[in-house]
């Protein structure tokens, strides 16, 4: 009898310990990344297994020569307008993940995004580390703040796509997204284009993009980048010459979501 009591107690301790480890792993910070192979090969996505039970988007089908242009826009400047001009001239629809700053400072630019058929998406209200958000109410507030401001300013509803700032998330983040019916969006290509004081040269940027693009590429660019604004037309023309087409997030979701 004493043996069974000890065994039961031990099992309870193990159960508590296991639940604690599980809880910790659910909130552990995860940083999204990919391993580029160059030569237009699809990259290695080490974290794809973590996303298998979610509807997260990060790459399209391997057998389709389609790319998806996505932009993280925290604020507005003349480069954002130039990028919109280029997309319009090619009749390409992109996805813009926005913060409150660009709505407050460049409302007409944000409205133009929607008017011209681009998908305007959620990049949170504070651009904080979403892996640290462990309460679903706080998480919802992060999404609602920018979405409500967008609605009030433009009259449009924000699309139900969400990109965590700097790609920081946790398993809990994915659970919150599923509960709130929001689709997380990551990427299979990005490069160091965000710092306007240290912009890469147009030649190096084009080489980086054109050597890394691949079937199903979800490309992350920052539209405030002068380099991106200067090279986007050339990049699109070259990709078209190579036989690539350009898809939307809704199209990608329809192909890969469970």
Each model region followed by its residue ranges:
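Metal-dependent polysaccharide deacetylase catalytic core of the NodB/CE4 family, i.e.
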Residues: 65-67, 77-79, 84, 88-220, ...
């Amino acid at each position: 009898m004493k043996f069974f009591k000890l065994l039961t107690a031990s099992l309870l301790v193990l159960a508590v310990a296991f639940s604690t480890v599980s809880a910790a792993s659910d909130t552990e910070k995860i940083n999204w990344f990919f391993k580029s192979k160059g030569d237009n090969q699809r990259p290695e996505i080490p974290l794809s297994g973590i996303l298998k039970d979610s509807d997260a988007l990060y790459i399209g089908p391997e057998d389709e020569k389609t790319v998806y242009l996505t932009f993280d826009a925290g604020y507005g400047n003349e480069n954002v307008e130039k990028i919109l001009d280029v997309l319009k001239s090619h009749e390409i629809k992109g996805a813009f993940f926005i913060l409150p700053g660009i709505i407050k400072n460049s409302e007409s630019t944000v409205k133009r995004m929607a008017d011209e058929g681009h998908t305007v998406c959620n990049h949170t209200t504070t651009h904080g580390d979403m892996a640290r958000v462990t309460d679903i109410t706080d998480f919802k507030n992060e999404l609602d703040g920018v979405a409500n401001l967008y609605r009030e300013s433009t009259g449009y509803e924000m699309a139900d796509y969400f990109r965590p700032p700097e790609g920081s998330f946790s398993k809990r983040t994915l659970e919150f997204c599923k509960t709130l019916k929001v689709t997380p969006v990551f990427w299979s290509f990005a490069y160091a284009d965000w710092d306007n004081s240290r912009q890469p040269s147009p030649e190096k940027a084009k080489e980086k993009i054109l050597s890394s693009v691949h079937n199903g590429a979800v490309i992350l660019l920052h539209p405030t980048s002068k380099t991106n604004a200067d090279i986007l037309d050339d990049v699109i023309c070259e990709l078209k010459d190579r036989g690539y087409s350009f898809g939307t997030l809704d199209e990608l979701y329809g192909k890969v979501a469970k």
